[in-house]
Protein backbone atom coordinates (compact mmCIF):
# COMPACT_ATOMS: atom_id res chain seq x y z
CA UNK A 1 0.00 0.00 0.00
CA UNK A 2 1.22 3.50 -0.85
CA UNK A 3 2.87 5.33 2.06
CA UNK A 4 2.91 9.10 1.42
CA UNK A 5 5.15 9.79 4.43
CA UNK A 6 7.68 7.24 3.20
CA UNK A 7 7.70 8.91 -0.21
CA UNK A 8 8.26 12.32 1.40
CA UNK A 9 11.11 10.95 3.53
CA UNK A 10 12.68 9.28 0.48
CA UNK A 11 12.49 12.53 -1.49
CA UNK A 12 14.30 14.37 1.32
CA UNK A 13 17.13 11.81 1.24
CA UNK A 14 17.35 12.06 -2.56
CA UNK A 15 17.44 15.87 -2.43
CA UNK A 16 20.36 15.69 0.01
CA UNK A 17 22.29 13.44 -2.41
CA UNK A 18 21.20 14.54 -5.90
CA UNK A 19 23.86 12.57 -7.81
CA UNK A 20 23.93 9.31 -5.87
CA UNK A 21 22.34 6.35 -7.61
CA UNK A 22 21.87 4.05 -4.59
CA UNK A 23 21.15 5.45 -1.14
CA UNK A 24 20.66 3.75 2.22
CA UNK A 25 17.47 4.91 3.86
CA UNK A 26 15.89 4.23 7.26
CA UNK A 27 12.17 4.70 7.77
CA UNK A 28 10.20 3.64 10.86
CA UNK A 29 13.28 1.79 12.17
CA UNK A 30 13.51 -0.37 9.04
CA UNK A 31 16.43 -0.30 6.59
CA UNK A 32 15.81 0.30 2.91
CA UNK A 33 17.71 1.32 -0.19
CA UNK A 34 16.61 3.90 -2.72
CA UNK A 35 17.69 3.11 -6.27
CA UNK A 36 17.46 5.93 -8.77
CA UNK A 37 17.31 6.11 -12.53
CA UNK A 38 20.84 7.49 -12.84
CA UNK A 39 23.65 5.94 -14.89
CA UNK A 40 26.54 4.55 -12.88
CA UNK A 41 28.80 5.57 -15.77
CA UNK A 42 30.46 2.16 -16.01
CA UNK A 43 30.70 -0.14 -19.00
CA UNK A 44 28.40 1.80 -21.31
CA UNK A 45 29.09 -0.65 -24.11
CA UNK A 46 27.63 -3.58 -22.18
CA UNK A 47 24.85 -1.79 -20.31
CA UNK A 48 21.50 -0.34 -21.30
CA UNK A 49 20.79 3.36 -20.90
CA UNK A 50 19.73 4.38 -17.39
CA UNK A 51 16.00 4.58 -18.14
CA UNK A 52 15.85 1.14 -19.80
CA UNK A 53 17.95 -0.34 -16.99
CA UNK A 54 15.54 1.12 -14.42
CA UNK A 55 12.47 -0.26 -16.20
CA UNK A 56 14.14 -3.64 -16.70
CA UNK A 57 15.09 -3.87 -13.05
CA UNK A 58 11.64 -3.00 -11.70
CA UNK A 59 10.02 -5.45 -14.11
CA UNK A 60 12.42 -8.31 -13.35
CA UNK A 61 12.21 -7.84 -9.57
CA UNK A 62 8.42 -7.97 -9.71
CA UNK A 63 8.43 -10.94 -12.07
CA UNK A 64 10.87 -12.92 -9.93
CA UNK A 65 9.08 -12.14 -6.66
CA UNK A 66 5.75 -13.19 -8.20
CA UNK A 67 7.22 -16.69 -8.55
CA UNK A 68 9.97 -17.09 -5.95
CA UNK A 69 11.09 -14.58 -3.25
CA UNK A 70 14.70 -14.11 -4.35
CA UNK A 71 14.70 -10.40 -5.24
CA UNK A 72 14.42 -7.42 -2.90
CA UNK A 73 10.91 -6.39 -1.92
CA UNK A 74 10.00 -3.12 -3.65
CA UNK A 75 7.88 -1.07 -1.24
CA UNK A 76 7.61 2.19 -3.18
CA UNK A 77 7.97 3.05 -6.86
CA UNK A 78 8.33 6.48 -8.40
CA UNK A 79 8.84 7.57 -11.99
CA UNK A 80 12.62 7.63 -11.56
CA UNK A 81 13.34 5.69 -8.37
CA UNK A 82 12.20 2.80 -6.25
CA UNK A 83 12.61 1.89 -2.59
CA UNK A 84 13.43 -1.68 -1.63
CA UNK A 85 13.87 -3.41 1.70
CA UNK A 86 17.47 -4.00 2.74
CA UNK A 87 18.42 -7.65 2.28
CA UNK A 88 21.70 -8.16 4.11
CA UNK A 89 25.36 -7.86 3.17
CA UNK A 90 26.89 -8.64 -0.25
CA UNK A 91 28.52 -12.08 -0.41
CA UNK A 92 31.86 -10.51 -1.27
CA UNK A 93 31.92 -9.02 2.26
CA UNK A 94 30.75 -12.12 4.13
CA UNK A 95 34.21 -13.71 4.31
CA UNK A 96 35.50 -10.70 6.27
CA UNK A 97 32.41 -9.87 8.31
CA UNK A 98 31.02 -13.36 9.03
CA UNK A 99 33.75 -15.87 8.12
CA UNK A 100 31.90 -18.62 9.97
CA UNK A 101 28.99 -18.15 7.54
CA UNK A 102 31.02 -18.08 4.32
CA UNK A 103 30.55 -21.70 3.23
CA UNK A 104 26.85 -21.77 4.12
CA UNK A 105 26.21 -18.43 2.41
CA UNK A 106 27.92 -19.46 -0.82
CA UNK A 107 26.18 -22.84 -0.83
CA UNK A 108 22.78 -21.21 -0.28
CA UNK A 109 23.52 -18.72 -3.05
CA UNK A 110 24.13 -21.64 -5.42
CA UNK A 111 20.90 -23.29 -4.29
CA UNK A 112 19.01 -20.01 -4.76
CA UNK A 113 20.43 -19.59 -8.26
CA UNK A 114 19.33 -23.14 -9.13
CA UNK A 115 15.89 -22.40 -7.70
CA UNK A 116 15.62 -19.24 -9.79
CA UNK A 117 16.61 -21.21 -12.87
CA UNK A 118 14.06 -23.94 -12.08
CA UNK A 119 11.37 -21.29 -12.67
CA UNK A 120 12.85 -20.54 -16.09
CA UNK A 121 14.21 -17.22 -14.84
CA UNK A 122 17.74 -15.81 -14.81
CA UNK A 123 19.55 -12.98 -13.06
CA UNK A 124 21.85 -11.63 -15.75
CA UNK A 125 24.97 -11.08 -13.64
CA UNK A 126 25.00 -13.01 -10.36
CA UNK A 127 28.35 -11.69 -9.12
CA UNK A 128 29.07 -12.02 -5.40
CA UNK A 129 28.65 -8.25 -4.99
CA UNK A 130 25.08 -8.62 -6.34
CA UNK A 131 24.00 -11.36 -3.95
CA UNK A 132 23.01 -10.45 -0.38
CA UNK A 133 23.25 -12.74 2.65
CA UNK A 134 21.12 -11.99 5.69
CA UNK A 135 23.15 -13.19 8.67
CA UNK A 136 20.05 -13.39 10.89
CA UNK A 137 17.48 -15.04 8.59
CA UNK A 138 20.12 -16.99 6.59
CA UNK A 139 18.36 -15.85 3.41
CA UNK A 140 19.82 -15.08 -0.01
CA UNK A 141 18.57 -12.15 -2.12
CA UNK A 142 19.78 -11.33 -5.61
CA UNK A 143 20.37 -7.61 -6.23
CA UNK A 144 20.88 -5.47 -9.33
CA UNK A 145 18.46 -6.96 -11.84
CA UNK A 146 19.03 -4.33 -14.54
CA UNK A 147 21.48 -6.37 -16.61
CA UNK A 148 19.67 -7.82 -19.63
CA UNK A 149 22.16 -7.41 -22.47
CA UNK A 150 22.68 -10.56 -24.55
CA UNK A 151 26.06 -11.05 -26.23
CA UNK A 152 26.02 -14.80 -26.63
CA UNK A 153 23.42 -17.10 -28.08
CA UNK A 154 23.28 -19.38 -25.06
CA UNK A 155 20.67 -20.07 -22.43
CA UNK A 156 20.84 -17.10 -20.02
CA UNK A 157 20.81 -19.53 -17.09
CA UNK A 158 24.07 -21.09 -18.34
CA UNK A 159 25.64 -17.64 -18.49
CA UNK A 160 24.36 -16.98 -14.94
CA UNK A 161 26.11 -20.11 -13.67
CA UNK A 162 29.34 -19.20 -15.44
CA UNK A 163 29.32 -15.65 -14.03
CA UNK A 164 28.51 -16.92 -10.52
CA UNK A 165 31.46 -19.33 -10.53
CA UNK A 166 33.73 -16.75 -12.17
CA UNK A 167 32.87 -14.25 -9.43
CA UNK A 168 33.82 -16.83 -6.77
CA UNK A 169 37.34 -17.04 -8.18
CA UNK A 170 37.64 -13.33 -9.02
CA UNK A 171 36.81 -12.37 -5.43
CA UNK A 172 39.40 -14.81 -4.08
CA UNK A 173 36.90 -16.72 -1.96
CA UNK A 174 38.93 -18.76 0.57
CA UNK A 175 39.20 -22.53 0.38
CA UNK A 176 39.66 -24.89 -2.49
CA UNK A 177 36.13 -26.19 -2.80
CA UNK A 178 33.00 -25.00 -4.49
Range-by-range predicted roles:
Residues 64, 112-116:
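Conserved hydrophobic alpha-helix
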Residues 7-55:
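ATP-binding glycine-rich loop module of kinase domains
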Residues 118-130:
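Catalytic-loop of the protein kinase fold
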Amino acid sequence: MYDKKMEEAARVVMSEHPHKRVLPFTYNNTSYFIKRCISNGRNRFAKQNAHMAYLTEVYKIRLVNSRVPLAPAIVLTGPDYFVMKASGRPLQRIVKEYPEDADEAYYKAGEALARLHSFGLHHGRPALRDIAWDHVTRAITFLDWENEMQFFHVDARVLDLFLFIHSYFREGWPGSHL
